[in-house]
Swiss-Prot record:
It comes from Bradyrhizobium sp. (strain ORS 278). The keyword ATP-binding applies. It catalyses: (R)-4'-phosphopantetheine + ATP + H(+) = 3'-dephospho-CoA + diphosphate. The keyword Oxidoreductase does not apply. Its EC number is 2.7.7.3. This is Phosphopantetheine adenylyltransferase. It comes from the Bacteria.
Length: 164
């Protein structure tokens, strides 16, 4: 049986924190699906297509190097439903700190009730990327700050262009 894992998020933009989670997750599964959430009530900085392209460009080579199949797709329903539809048995969630853990434990409990066959796997962020959040990265970029420490090289120019 193929171990399929779903890693959901907005990825607006892809950050080094996301990359850190993917680097760990590809060793836990045979196929990793990065699921880009589409929330109709929110206006992301990057379009859905741009976020999917970033995911493929940044995460695809990492998965390939680890011998893990990779795909990126979108979803606009419950994350647990997206995981079921993808055939996932694992849901990957990154943790930066205790606040994340408290929130993620609630989600994991609700998801387990709705889909007992899907196990949530918490991946702790490596120390250098723990403070990174996509919202802080967007704020820094909007104010002309240096973002290259927080996002993969291929994301720097597109992110700066959004605020040019």
């Amino acid at each position: 049986m193929q171990r399929i894992a779903l890693y959901p998020g907005s990825f607006d933009p892809v950050t080094n924190g996301h990359l850190d989670v993917v680097r760990q997750a590809v060793h836990l599964c045979d196929k990793l699906i990065v699921a880009v959430g589409v929330h109709h009530g929110k206006k992301p900085l990057f379009s859905t297509e741009e976020r999917l392209a970033m995911a493929h460009e940044v995460f695809g080579p990492v998965a390939s190097a680890a011998g893990c199949a990779f795909d990126a797709s979108t979803y606009d329903n419950l994350t647990v439903t997206a995981a079921q539809q993808a055939g996932a048995i694992l849901m990957i969630r990154g943790l930066r700190d205790g606040t994340d853990l408290d929130y993620e434990m609630q989600l994991a409990g609700m998801n387990q009730t709705m889909a007992p066959s899907i196990q949530t796997v918490f991946v702790p962020a490596s120390v250098p990327v723990r403070p990174i959040t996509a919202s802080l990265v967007r704020q820094i970029a909007a104010m002309g700050g240096e973002i290259s420490h927080f996002v993969p090289p291929s994301v720097v120019a597109p992110l700066k262009a959004k605020f040019a």
